[in-house]
């Protein structure tokens, strides 16, 4: 996977290309004409942990199945989100790296109800992070702030005090390894009343149960779950009998 700096640089270039083809003022007018959208996080929670399914491409049959299986929401990049918007009844989360307000207008026009803001991407630019958070709220987008360390959590709480956080279950070296203990440790510092999402390495019922006991509200499942037998995967993760 490319480094964070390379991802940020590539994203900025791509956004500039799209902005030249379709000016921000045009997007602002189109967003202003949209009807209000149901808050994304209203789909999360309840008595049991929720599941959000990441998808790589628009797939009507998969979306119908996900809805039947009571998946809380779907998550995808901008392209698939825009393609599936017309035929999808589930709330949608943008998974793209967001670095520019322009993307928030694109996201809202694609039908999504929430975006991820990665705290590490704004380590040296808290002003831009605050700007993105504010603009997202102005266009009816919920914001989920991804934090990987306690200092990022503290800074996000001080700067934004967001309603939702994403905690990735990854090792301290960010080498692709999975470590749930980092998530459990961070959860102890998340104030009560926040909505917490977990992502990475969740494939067993015992892992889901441990996350739920620790205060996680929703698990974001990777595309692997949708590529196989989604019904069976969810049955196992929920601990349901056949």
Residue ranges, per PLM feature:
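An N-cap/entry alpha-helix motif that binds or orients negatively charged groups
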Residues: 1-60
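N-terminal active-site wall of soluble small-molecule enzyme domains
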Residues: 53, 57-141, 150-155, 164-166, ...
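Short secondary-structure boundary segments
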Residues: 78, 119, 169, 200-201, ...
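Catalytic cores of alpha/beta
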Residues: 92, 99-111, 149-161, 192-221
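Short gly/pro/ser/thr-enriched loop/turn and capping motifs at secondary-structure boundaries
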Residues: 100, 123, 172-174, 226-228
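P-loop NTP-binding/switch modules centered on Walker-like glycine-rich loops
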Residues: 144-145
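Active-site-adjacent loop and "lid" segments of alpha/beta metabolic enzymes
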Residues: 177-180, 185-187, 195-198, 204-205
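C-terminal helical cap(s) of enzyme catalytic domains, especially alpha/beta-barrels
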Residues: 180-189, 212, 221-242
